[in-house]
């Protein structure tokens, strides 16, 4: 994949450094320092900010990816294209600010009417959604600008590492009573503000970016096309941005903020599944956009198949490692008995994240094709289905209902989307190479069942402290099955890129 692979690898390294920090923060510091209802509150505030910030973009991120090839001109600093990416979201945020204060009462009532534990906290801190939304908005916009210039590493580092390190610091200050809970909420606002500032400075350092808009470059036809596209993307974003958050909102509103905290931990565990796609997808989108702009369907099809295959390999292996160690993870967590309530939600959410990250490239293809307006139909369908299923299942099955609603909604959505883009565009991300990957993972699950039944009791028994034996057991089986899985991939030659990577790693160890 050339530059796609190189930038993706660097971005993935930054992502997994962030994952390491995030694991310590989320599963050990946060659960130790905060009560479940406080965890639920912070997550709901951040999710509301991400939702409103996403809507305030007015489709800027998608529009930027689609129209940048028309502006791309290094000699003329891209005709001030990046100025548009600042102006449009600012207009959107102004509308959001007005809507927020008009409907704040209804928002507070939704989260407090039926919720039990922790609802009063939301009413107290709801105004902090505004600064968090503003900073989240421009963190995303500046990261998209960097992606367009194929410079994803620093913005990725800021998002995946910087924000997590800052979050860790905030929780430690709260744990040691340097901050009270008010200080925690204010601290998040300061943290996101600093992240936005770093991204601004980085963009200026590239010296390619100009925020001075060249109004004369915008032809009437381009203006009409842009406004028409943006109109659809705004409506699509209204549905698309809501989906990942709906289950969290319903769990908090229809059960309690305490269970929302449990659901947050389950969601954070499952989020590891899609980490590779965050880099792979970010660096692939400009190339897919360029291929679609040139009507190079074959190139777009090759990119989609490659992204889908490599994300499925990475995601399914990570899902396997997470699930075979899930009980051990809950044994390690502070207040683990409380968060163990989310065990099956972890599995359902992990499967949902695997489905989403594997096939999310289909939404990219549709957005950059001449059929982009169909994205509105698909996302409204997804939103409607998700709302209905959450409203039906959360009151019945609590967090498991929310997780199941998430999985079923995405599964149906992507089946329909796969059929559509094959029919209308001629792109099919699915390939036969996915089958051997699925078979390898299923066989590994069978081996794990045998291991757990026969060997785990023997490994744990000699130790006075069971946690020591469980740690050894987790390390042994994870290492063995991971190596076995990679060996199987290598022998079956599922991916030449994976084989080349294994060869390079093997050569390093062999030379030593």
What are the functions of these language-model segments?
Residues 57-73, 148, 266-308, 363-368:
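Helix-loop junctions and terminal segments of transmembrane helices
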Residues 106-129, 323-353, 460-468:
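Interfacial segments at transmembrane-helix termini and the short loops linking adjacent helices
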Residues 3-62, 92-101, 112, 132, ...:
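Signature of the first transmembrane helix
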